[in-house]
Amino acid sequence: MGRIKVCNFGRIMLKIFCWTTVILSIYLILGFTGCYEKWFGGPAGIVKAPVYWLIRAGIGIIVESIIFWIGIIMVYATSEQLGIRWRVLGIVCGWIPVAHLVMLHIIIKTVGEEVRMEKMRAKRNLQRKAQRICSTKYPVLMVHGVFFRDFEHLNYWGRIPAELEANGAVIYYGNHNSAAAVRDSAKELAERIHQIIRETGCEKVNVIAHSKGGLDMRAALALTDIAPYVASLTTINTPHRGCQFADYLLGKIPGKQQQMVANTYNAGAAKLGDINPDFLAAVYDLKSEKCSEFNNEIKDNPDIYYQSVGSKLNHPASGRFPLNFTYPLVKYFDGPNDGLVGEESFRWGQNYQFLTVSGKRGISHGDMIDLNRENIKGFDVREFYVQVVAGLKKMGF
């Protein structure tokens, strides 16, 4: 909560700045016009006593500047919800009369909502701390999707793992390549699960897999020997039936251009730690035809609990880049979608949850892993995962 305390102090300083600026302005206007002399026999106006009022105006401006800069630096340095957009607009509009007041109001309001949310969350976690509602029988393995890696200082899952751990969960990560064929990723994940079993002595793991990671894990359970070591698989926005828009793009883009993109990606991924990354193999395994073949071959294990989650955006403009651009294309081919995957592709297993919120916002593919660390009205992504894991605990997993 240290960050939130600093953020809240900055917000308070900005509110103080607003009120004291109004008071100072009224004080100086009345003083400049000689009202104090007329009403109380006080100091004369600025025409008769310019030095007197210029000194006071200068002191007031200096004090107000100090209050403002302390506040704005604190909220800019600590707020997660301001994001790049509001920070940049705040800087730009700071030089524009009237617009700077509107932006200051937005900044104070946004930070205030963030502070209230985090305080509420901290209070709730404190109240249920003894219950350890996410302390499952088996640890949780979180499996990333395509084109991402598990970095130590840039968590793929945003603020979610910390929230789960605060409620008693033990978390591990897949640590597999960012781009590979489903079957190759399956082998990597099988090796990772064996490693966790060896090093910790746990009997099994509960897997939560996002996007292509869900296909990777289904393949691992069916094609490798790790099924006895997995209690449950929860897939998040996984394209179980593929992506028809991917079929279209791959059919339209010439092979030469595809290979150029693949070579560029593979070279970059290798520098970041991937071993033999394969961009095209990963992408082609997401085609609807490939997923249909995959589903005919890969069968669920009756001894493992499978469940799935999906979500959708309500409007293209509500998604963050690049999902705001891909949404219309995906909608044309796949219908309602999360910016990448169509609604019809999400459902898998014994239990299925489909998530959205009212209004234009919706919940994107990236929102489901807290990619932008954004608090969405009507959907608390961190608490959602807490309840998912708490549900696994209640089921004995």
Region roles according to the model:
Residues V51-I62, L89-V92, D300-F397:
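C-terminal catalytic-base region of ester-bond hydrolases, centering on the histidine
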Residues M1-H153, F397:
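Flexible, membrane-associating and regulatory peripheral segments of lipid-active enzymes
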